[in-house]
């Protein structure tokens, strides 16, 4: 038995650290990261099925323009007035050189998403898309469209419990907005 313990303790596997590596040089697992402002906006448009994939052509539209359903990379960025959505999610200042982008996480970002007309419009579109299905299947479809996965049994049970209240029975847009604002949507593991 002592020989077995000695062999295990002296092995390279036993001596490896279990702490997170900042450089992650061996790429054993991806570090968790938040979507950038552009990626977040585009992901919401894709989830709601509204992203325009055709050649944009013509004049660029502001990010805040409700008719702008193109990718954010094609949007007009004003150096004087940076869009509030982009500003909340660490879009770099267009007036100065930025070698890299900072990443901050603040409560204001969640509040902005929960009160954003852009996010509410995407959520309403998602809610309207699956009107013909029952509750359980509708929840399943929303999870698949927004989070690209099925809900876990506990998530499904919690979601069904949410809709048992008759006042919330028709609040599918609110439910879709909660999924769009969730960490599972905002972050990639």
Sequence positions of predicted segments:
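Alpha-helical secondary-structure segments
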Residues: 1-10
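An acidic, gly/pro-interrupted, aromatic-rich
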Residues: 2-3, 15, 20-146, 150, ...
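Residue-level marker of structural boundaries
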Residues: 13-14, 168
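Amphipathic alpha-helical segments that form the core helices of the histone-fold
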Residues: 157-167
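Active-site neighborhood of thiol-dependent amide/isopeptide-bond enzymes
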Residues: 171
